[in-house]
């Protein structure tokens, strides 16, 4: 990633001190800010952006932006007491010292503001810009992809894409697969991503006798191709706190996938063309599997229609870039 950024003309600087050593980190950041004569400080570290703002205190920086990507308001401390003690003061630092508070979704912004009214010209939503090009050029070789994974040519693929961590709830997808195979015997599950629950996913699949029906692919650079060869996309995100945005949800639509979503997924990433069912996790895997079968009986979503809808949305790359540049001027 560093080399890609440098190739585009950026300068990549790694802090000589980790964030956990707060004093050393702040001193190093202040030294760089002083040396670089920066015009804009754009912080992407959610509530921890307070550390960057404090480090920049008194510096002649024209604009300070806090960009919030998650709604969990995580404070990296093993002590729950410290997390509670630090969270609100850090939020107040952001609200008082930043010129702009930007959320990647309506919920994310309002959660960070803690139900305070949005301030005109200061608090706003800026969606990710999504490039549809990779989805326009996929081959969509469904049979070839299945043979690569030693699956039957007519396998129906339930795709989970993202980190395999409790915050994404991947184990629930295995339960859904177990019920789904009772309705569609050719159903299989593919997990693209990695994380702390990789072993849990495999172990649960073994316990349910599904080991031969589950594939863990790790992180892949060809996710658009994998999506285009799948049948469903599942994201059973926990309902509290909700997903900050859900970029993979947008990508699944561009790939023409039917989607099974929990109430932990917001409306923000949904295009008008979306084919989806949103269900409570409490409904259990049987109802989720039934919803998958019902979606399968509907016409295959149009990739072209989804791409056209994206271009008319705030997630259009050109529109998102203009909005980002406006924040800096």
Language-model segment annotations:
Residues 27-30, 58, 83-101, 117-121:
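Membrane-proximal helix-turn-helix segments that form the acceptor-binding/catalytic region
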Residues 136-151:
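A short helix/loop element that forms part of the nucleotide-sugar donor recognition site in Leloir-type
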Residues 189, 197-200, 211-220, 226:
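Active-site donor-binding acidic/aromatic loop of nucleotide-activated sugar
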